[in-house]
């Protein structure tokens, strides 16, 4: 799809818009006729509305074939067209009563509630027919007639009182007559008293009845006087009488109709002005609410949307192919949930129409309207209000909102990730004979992948007459097909991908080599990059089709071009396992080996002696070398005391490399390849790696490494060591029992004793392992395992933790070699199981962290060479040790390396070492240390002033290539991957200080990284000094109070837990920003007290601390890219005379732009406060609504985008992936795409050898002859095999 638009805007659809999209009204709830299996007319699948189910055929079959294109059948009313229109054409439902869109009144915040200034619960009452709302009021008429109406009311009340008096008088005269009669009849006094009592009760009831009527009239009158537009009134006798008596002065109604009429009369401009005045005049909650309301009102004003569109008279029906019905076995059907939800709406709508036609009572009609509203709510967002509608098996039905949000929603399932053709997958096996840029592709898989190319070649060479017969040849396995496959596979790279693709090295390009079998062969050195092993892992193969894609795969993605790890710039293609065993064996020295002390005139002579059996490869000998580099000097010849094995190893290294005359283990080979990557070209490095791999495998097979139970040597003095520490432990226990120690002190003492005992046993065990022990060889060389594992097998298990995470103060004394007792086995099971559970949880948590990081940083792309801002950040290179000497800062290669200098670097005596603008290399760092430079000013993405993305100068070197980063590099994605990829290696634990669960917890590992990136306030955050001054400490029963008295007599109080470890003493002097208590700081407090640079350093160092503690190297610049995104926003404090609102969170660049505009026009500028936003919040607050909606909270983001008419400028990567554009990064940038190639004379003469003079004249001339026959140029020209012939 070619797209030419520059931005996407989303807005609110009007009733006319929906009718314009529609191809007809859906009137019936039926889907298909189950007898004929054809769609029902006017139903949810009707062909008259949505188009034919068969290509070029009307519903009844009268018109068939494409020659009737566009004809509408007069019999069945179906247009003759392609059936694919059923994916595009929409219908609509004409509602009998308006309904409210649930997104606008049930969202948080409720947009309808803010607009009309109604509480959401009151809004709910109106919409669902539980209360009336006054929608119009004739205030002038009421005011004019108020006196007359009151006189009328008083008259009614007087009449009621007169009637009351008359009724009582009548009752009195009746009573007197009755009593006279009873007295005449000489009735008893009790009987007369009873009659009198009944009569009095009757008169009281009469009076009460009339008083109630009068009171009711008073209430009716008060209600009428208090009526206001937007007022809510329950449906009771008072309001019914208000309507009966004064209905001419106002109009009140229920449901969406009431909301619609309010919205139609709503004056946005007037409301905005009133709210603006309120913001200036009010304080507290009223001001906050006014700001929130104004935000919603302004959204409607800027988008020019009609608020009445939030109430729907018409509902769109999406195309039937997007809510399909599929026939299953046994004649049953599986249908999309949307069909059930639409059916409920249509049924209720049709019933409401019938009730209205019949003139049903209002209460029945209102109930049906409420049910229609609920049906539409369920269609748009099922479960948002009340109980969700469920289908069979009590499963909640998926609504339109559910189709958009979540992992299986439209955004993430179909728009951001698509299945691709020309791909396959298979199990991987090792390919030890492959070169670094090659992979083994099974012949059958290659045949299927390259089938279209083979078909074309068969046709071009006239080996097959047509496509069908060519396909048949391939299926038969004709011998000619294999030759074609060999030809088309040449110079065509394929992409290999292993899931999970945690970083960019998870997809690399290789040149395929055809292999037998069905497994893909993988080069052993790229396993680390893919995190692959050969225990059943599978990999996917993808075929780049276009010439551009092939060029990108070859130049950018070929495995031999991806030797360095983008996270730290160190080589990732390192020999491992058996290769290291082979190299270690090859370079080992055995002084007593055969042939020791001999001298040879060349390596060849030594090899000859070895072949004759006179010399061992490990024997120390003297060999004469020519053209050798020793101690940094190149010598024509030199005799070196070495071994033949080391000489063989050095032959694998490139010319000019220093001679390696030491035992080669994992660390040595790592530093060798590190140096190779710095000094030599990629081609030479790749060739050297292949040679080292081959040498390693060759000698690993000859090393004879085996492991037997006898190789596991337990230290004989173990029992003696244990007995000594057992005695110490008993002493501690006795001290505890007599009350000299607390339980906490006892536990700490025991843990300390047994930790020391375990270390002593481990030392003794290591001494027991001879140098030629194979387990010793494996661990020492770095091929496999570590001494901790060996200690568990041969020494003792040591201390383990209980389920609470506390260390059990009694160790497991047995080793696995000796076997554990039942008790020891039982207490060690918890740790083993916890490890497996943690791994599963970590994988999910780490994946989610990576997703959030990618989302927040996805639009950080290198956009320009230099932003022009030369101020950077100062970083230490050396520090002065206790000995007074300068030492290299421990992590200089992860902080200073690869950056651009912001200023010249000079020695203490003012000699220039490096100029501003140069990139810092490893060699340059060494020169800084030698010259005594303590710190350097470097450019950083934290200070980059590029409006969009970052600039090349501020970012510095690309760690993946070792060269200055190119324009178009997606450094944000690389940063997110570099931080997220090792996430599974981090611990999940929260450590307990002092071994007590109630003590202060120190969050570490992955949760700590999340805490920092989300800028959360830590639990029991450590306070920081808000001024220079003196601290005094007050002890309370449960807590301590630290009181800081500043130098200008201000007092600050901090309450901390009693058990918190203080960093200050009573009377200590502190400076602004000093940490007062051990623990984590609140980033927001650091920003408030110390400023933006301090919070940047705190976040970067905090994340690095976690990764370094786990031995994971990451360059600071990756963390800085994320921190830059976290500090993009500011909160407006005073909006001045700008369009911003107080309290609004706004992008810094937008804030500065609006302020510049105001300044230019002489208006008052705004002021703002810097904010640190967590990565989730920063992702949702991005300029791109497409990116935010596809991340999280889809419905909320879309609702806000719709009411404000948000425009998406399509700057980031995600939004361009969603709409199918090339991403604005790498070769997708216009700077690389809008390039006109200029042919060089050599290229012309090589391409068109016979027509050179004509072409040169053509190129030199100002204009081209329109009659020139360009096709003649290709005569006699050798075209590539897959050149597309028209």
UniProtKB/Swiss-Prot annotation:
Cofactor binding, per record: Binds 1 Mg(2+) ion per subunit.
Q: So what does this thing catalyse?
A: RNA(n) + a ribonucleoside 5'-triphosphate = RNA(n+1) + diphosphate
**Could you say which residues bind Zn(2+) 1 here?**
58, 60, 73, 76
For this protein, the record's SMART domains field holds: RPOLA_N
A Pfam match is RNA_pol_Rpb1_2
Give binding positions for Mg(2+): 533, 535, 537
Please give the Gene Ontology molecular function terms for this protein.
Answer: DNA binding; DNA-directed RNA polymerase activity; magnesium ion binding; zinc ion binding
Question: Which SUPFAM superfamilies does the record match to this protein?
Answer: beta and beta-prime subunits of DNA dependent RNA-polymerase (SSF64484)
Please give the InterPro entries that the UniProt record associates with this protein.
DNA-dir_RpoC_beta_prime, DNA-dir_RpoC_beta_prime_bact, RNA_pol_asu, RNA_pol_N, RNA_pol_Rpb1_1, RNA_pol_Rpb1_3, RNA_pol_Rpb1_3_sf, RNA_pol_Rpb1_4
Sorted UniProt keywords: DNA-directed RNA polymerase, Magnesium, Metal-binding, Nucleotidyltransferase, Transcription, Transferase, Zinc
Tell me, which GO biological process terms does this entry list? DNA-templated transcription
**Which cofactor names does the annotation list?**
Mg(2+); Zn(2+)
Q: Which residues bind Zn(2+) 2?
A: 867, 944, 951, 954
- Please give the GO cellular component terms listed in this UniProt entry: DNA-directed RNA polymerase complex
Q: Which domain of life is it from?
A: Bacteria
Question: Which family would the database say this protein is a member of?
Answer: Belongs to the RNA polymerase beta' chain family.
Q: Which HAMAP family match?
A: RNApol_bact_RpoC
* NCBIfam families per UniProt: PRK14906.1 (NF011498), rpoC_TIGR (TIGR02386)
On subunit structure and binding partners, the annotation says: The RNAP catalytic core consists of 2 alpha, 1 beta, 1 beta' and 1 omega subunit. When a sigma factor is associated with the core the holoenzyme is formed, which can initiate transcription.
Q: What is this protein called?
A: DNA-directed RNA polymerase subunit beta'
